[in-house]
Amino acid sequence: MKKIGITLGDPSGISPEILIKSIDKLKKAIYVIYGSYKIIEKVSSILDKKTEINIIDSPEEAEKEGVYLINVYDRDFCVGKPDKETGKASVLFLERAVKDILSKKLDAIVTLPISKEYVMKAGFRYAGHTDYLADITKTEDYLMMLLCEKMKVALVTTHIPLKDVPENIKPEILESKIRLLNRELQSKFGIKKPKIAVLGLNPHAGDGGNIGREEIDIINPVVQKLKSEGIDLEGSLSADTAFNRYREFDAYLAMYHDQGLIPLKLLCFKKAVNITLGIPFIRTSPDHGTGFDIAGKGIADPSSFIEAVKLALKLSKQY
């Protein structure tokens, strides 16, 4: 039976609530939560919901279908009040789960949201899960991709300031990202010949060089080179109209975060899933953040987390 690790993320956010609301739906596998028993107990009380979780020390102790908890860092966290301690907890939950999956004790991991602000206050030097996972696994070619039933969007750059995006759009980087996306669509999603839309960087894809030259100098030559090798690409496309054609493409490759994720979340919010492509194990996560402002109010929607679990379990069965 497959073992799916779940990291609790920031314990003062909506993650404990989402997890508690989803427990009855966690079926057909062994689920190992990396978190804090006290916060799960506290939020269960707030929600007036009885939560039965088996506490273990290692995934190897979990032998039958059910939900288990490794009590990684147990403190009396305050709901909706993040601080350096909740940031530290987020990091410890993640580090333990990654250690276990690299030791082959898990088949996939699902990561609940962390706060970049508070993990950095706790000494974490990464902009998010994706960069950490790539570094810890020594993965050079990796991609952040969000997907739902209607659309898949991968990103060339992720959590960097907008002003730094152009200098990170380089021919060798773009080429490796396209090749990786094509391979992963084939291997993980069973698409024999993926059709990929490559977006431009500038408005109207540079308008023939009048609004920037990145398309002419970098993006279009890479697209043409890879098309000549048989990869089915179209681009560079103007991002303001490209998403009207989402039914025509198996995936989009966006140049930066908001360019790709605004349309995806508009179309699929609450159902989208984040997956890290290129790393040597399966990692998914929901498409939302920590939700500190609504933590403890009982209104957090677990739908995206449930979809992330479903995808992790589905992909784990292929390996």
UniProtKB/Swiss-Prot annotation:
GO terms for biological process: pyridoxal phosphate biosynthetic process; pyridoxine biosynthetic process. Its cofactor is a divalent metal cation. SUPFAM superfamilies: Isocitrate/Isopropylmalate dehydrogenase-like. Binds 1 divalent metal cation per subunit. Catalyzes the NAD(P)-dependent oxidation of 4-(phosphooxy)-L-threonine (HTP) into 2-amino-3-oxo-4-(phosphooxy)butyric acid which spontaneously decarboxylates to form 3-amino-2-oxopropyl phosphate (AHAP). Substrate binds at residues 129-130, 265, 274, 283. Homodimer. The gene is pdxA. Keywords: Cytoplasm, Metal-binding, NAD, NADP, Oxidoreductase, Pyridoxine biosynthesis. A divalent metal cation binds at residues 159, 204, 257. This is 4-hydroxythreonine-4-phosphate dehydrogenase. It comes from Persephonella marina (strain DSM 14350 / EX-H1).
